[in-house]
Amino acid sequence: MTQEQSQPAKDLISDQLVRYLEDRGVEHIFGLCGHTNIAVLSSLAESSVRFINVRHEQISAHAADGYARVTGKASVLLSHLSPGLTNAATGVANAAMDCIPMVVIAGDIPSYYYGKHPHQEVNLHADASQYEIYRPFVKRAWRVDTAELLPEILEKAFLLAESGQPGPVLVNVPMDIFSAEIDPALWDRQKANTKELTKPSIDDETAREIITNLTNASAPVLYVGGGVALAKAYDELRDFVDHMQIPVSHSLMGKGVLADDHPLVLGMTGFWGMKFTNEQTLNADWILGLGTRFKEADCSSWYPQYTFNIGEGASKLIHIDIEPQEIGRNYPTEIGVIADLKSALKVLNRVAREMLPDGRKPNPLIEKIADERSRLAAQNVEMQTSEAFPMMPDRIFADLTAANPPDETP
């Protein structure tokens, strides 16, 4: 066997990268062309993956953010180096603050120019250090210095973006690595890796303790956040609310996880919440927080006299979230559970039906909620039907709501 025959067949990384994304089910990539990512764009020309080209990188980042929110899967953003990456920063940071999964693939200067300060290199504190810009808000930032490591780094990037508390990650790739050739077997081995991690749930004993406390409570309230949407636990939440007859307040990110016209939905809390809603959460004896971070605006800057008064001698908190750091961050927690919301609510629903086969009695607060909605509707009729120009925001949203089916986003 000759030396030439013994060498494994190799292929361009850019071509293999695109095939990898196809295999993962990626259908769209958002970004803008630049000389550091042109090799990937060339490989995309014959691919089923559609490249959404925009006029500014911030647009691509916001588009990728919105796409991930709708699909529930990590979106892909392809960025040019330095100014391209900094232009995208606001959109990526916004996704990070809202826990939206995103894989940012950024081109960078050629690796053989490290230390020479080539065109558009970020190098004030270290050579080729543009990835450092993203460190404060991505879950992890990789700089790919070895071509052969890109396949496993990219696999880790997708898993990390979508697991636990989701969020963006950055894979920083020198432009010469996109055009390098490596053994396709390095990519093939990633196909054997699981594409979804098993998420933690809640044990029956803890579930029974939670149901017992909520059943014995005189004024329990649910407070739900965006974690319910990220877990796609809409049906499980509705079943739990209907069976337990507990009113539901929500954060800004939790709006829509239970239909606004559900008879037990109180509405948003905090600065943008109504007085009626804040009064219910303030006077609750037990609060079940689901997938929420108890952020400042949703909690009236945590002043105990406005929205939540949680602590000794006041409301008691049960908090379920996928991220351990969120438990007890802003309020003392009686029962804290690290779990995926969909899995946890399935267990809670099962245990609730075992303990309360017929459910709790209809909550008398339903009538007060209906009265409050009628009052607000009457109060807003004039603005929602106004013929004023420029158009009133209330009129715009009323018309959009009327024109769209209930389950559509205007």
Regions found by a protein language model. Give the residues of each.
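Conformationally flexible catalytic loops at phosphate/diphosphate-handling active centers
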Residues: 8, 128, 156, 160-216
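Glycine-rich phosphate/diphosphate-binding loops that line cofactor/substrate pockets in enzymes
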Residues: 14-27, 66-71, 160-165, 206-221, ...
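Active-site diphosphate/adenylate-binding microenvironment
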Residues: 14-17, 22-26, 32, 40-45, ...
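Short internal beta-strands
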Residues: 31-33, 105-106, 172, 245-252, ...
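Glycine-rich beta-alpha junction loops
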Residues: 36, 109-110, 173-179, 226-228, ...
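Thiamine diphosphate
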Residues: 38-110, 116, 270-271, 275-295
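Glycine-rich, acidic loop regions that bind phosphate or pyrophosphate groups
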Residues: 108-151, 254-370
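Glycine-rich phosphate/diphosphate-binding loop of Rossmann-like nucleotide-binding domains
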Residues: 221, 229-245
